[in-house]
């Protein structure tokens, strides 16, 4: 009797765990338009970037391959929404959290697409980054292989089957030289990668960042007809997500230039330039101060 009760309790826990996982899954995957999906990040699982996919009549175009452990879950999520073959995965830029999962998509039958500049950055920078990785256990990259993009474009690449139209449009240099977005004009959706973020913090301290061109790229992005903006990091937003990041960057650059003209040090400007009032992007003080120091060094060159 005790054994039967224990078995019943175990089965109940198993069912509860299953439904908890299913509930979590439904919260992570959003269908933001018919056949257009977003898979939100899971930072606690080191899946720090959002991803997406578009289900065409005969195939699937995925957007951002994530890390390998993220790609594995994203591929499973895609299979829950469609059985159509995954023919392409688009890397918005070459960084690890958006592109290191490429090989899993290739093994599923997809070709990796990005800008020509992104292809060059991947070949030049991702090989040493991959080899120098210090991840452990499930986050050890040695379990997988590095796969560089195979198809490149310089102006734009368009996927259109009459039901969906996706335009891959170069936007760099900004966050990286090879930045590009996926734009769906019919649905007014933009997958922006790290060109635009909707959370506290920013990536201006990244060595690849081009501060002044990034502002110009955000100005260009603001001219798109966007109802839904899917950032590389942060919650899904709208067109109004662009202005705060643009304001943060332009105010930062202007403040640093003024400080340099006064002969101030990077540390002094980082401590005195208060950008916390710019919601939400300016609210991470530590990241903003790191960005100020990085931009200071670039503007002094």
Predicted features along the sequence, with ranges:
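Positively charged n-region of N-terminal signal peptides that target proteins for export
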Residues: 1-4
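Accessory terminal helices/loops
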Residues: 223-225, 236-301
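Conserved beta-strand hairpin/beta-sheet module of binuclear metal-dependent hydrolase folds
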Residues: 30-77, 182-194
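Divalent metal-coordination and catalytic microenvironments
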Residues: 35, 54, 64, 78, ...
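Active-site metal-binding motif and surrounding structural segment of the metallo-beta-lactamase
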Residues: 56-61, 69-113
């Amino acid at each position: 009797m005790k054994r039967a009760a224990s078995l019943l309790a175990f089965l109940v826990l198993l069912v509860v765990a299953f439904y908890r996982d299913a509930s979590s899954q439904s919260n992570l995957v959003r269908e933001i338009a018919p056949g257009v999906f977003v898979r939100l990040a899971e930072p606690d699982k080191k899946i720090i970037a959002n991803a997406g996919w578009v289900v065409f009549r005969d195939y699937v175009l995925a957007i951002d391959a994530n890390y390998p452990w993220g790609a594995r879950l994203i591929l499973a999520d895609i299979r829950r929404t469609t059985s159509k073959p995954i023919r392409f995965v688009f890397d918005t830029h070459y960084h690890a959290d958006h592109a290191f999962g490429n090989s899993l998509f290739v093994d599923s039958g997809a070709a990796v697409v990005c800008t020509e500049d992104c292809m060059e950055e991947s070949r030049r920078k991702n090989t040493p980054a991959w080899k120098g990785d210090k991840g452990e256990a499930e986050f050890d990259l040695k379990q997988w292989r590095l796969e560089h993009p195979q198809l490149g474009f310089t102006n734009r690449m368009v996927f259109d089957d009459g039901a969906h139209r996706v335009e891959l449009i170069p936007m760099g240099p900004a966050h990286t030289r090879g930045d590009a977005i996926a734009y769906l004009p019919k649905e007014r959706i933009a997958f922006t990668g790290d060109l635009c973020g909707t959370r506290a913090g920013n990536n201006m301290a990244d060595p690849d960042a081009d501060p002044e061109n990034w502002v110009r790229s955000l100005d260009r992005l603001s001219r798109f007809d966007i109802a839904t903006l899917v950032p590389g990091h942060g919650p899904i937003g709208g067109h109004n997500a662009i202005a705060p990041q643009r304001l943060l960057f332009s105010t930062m650059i202007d403040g640093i230039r003024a400080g340099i003209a006064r002969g101030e040090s990077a540390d002094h400007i980082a401590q005195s330039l208060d950008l916390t009032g710019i919601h939400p992007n300016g609210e991470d003080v530590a990241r903003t101060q790191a960005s100020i120091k990085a931009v200071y060094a670039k503007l002094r060159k």
